[in-house]
Amino acid sequence: MRRLKVIMALGVLLSALGAVITASPALAGRGPQWQPPTPGGPPFTLPASYCGFKLRVAFPVNHEYTKVLHHADGSTTFLFTGAVTASYTNLQTGKAITVPENGPGKATIHADGSITEVHTGRNGPFILSPADATRFGLPTVSVDAGKLAFSVSAPPRVITSLSLHGHVLVDVCAALT
């Protein structure tokens, strides 16, 4: 009986060690200071003013790693990379789509509170107010491919510039209508 307990304890120890060794290359390949993914953010609902119906957004898969860099000028940069999957549901009809959004990105919050972001690859959900969607000629809710860059002023958080060198992969509202 004692031998069985020792064998079981060694088995548990080796399994735990195997899990650590298996996870290490994923973090090591990204270098130091990368934080492993946390569970996807909580689902949220956009009001009908965005799509003509209430839209539920959830993140069933989150394998996104983050690195936080603090700068001498008081700004903070967030680097992120990895796979995220978002699901979008029209709450009026129940129609839903799921979209992989695997693009890396960089967001800098400047000391004055303004924000600059650059995303490449597949990225989303990119959400604009109806007024900003009209101003920039983009859908209110989209998944995009290519380089998406934008700047936001310090509070009250007005988009001051936006460029998409790529294309809209999914106009979420149109896809769920």
Features from the language model and the residues they span:
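Functionally constrained cores in energy, signaling, and assembly domains
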Residues: 5, 15, 139
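Beta-strand-enriched cores of mature, soluble protein domains
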Residues: 29-177
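C-terminal segment of classical bacterial N-terminal signal peptides
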Residues: 15-25
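Bacterial N-terminal signal peptides that target proteins for export
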Residues: 1-10
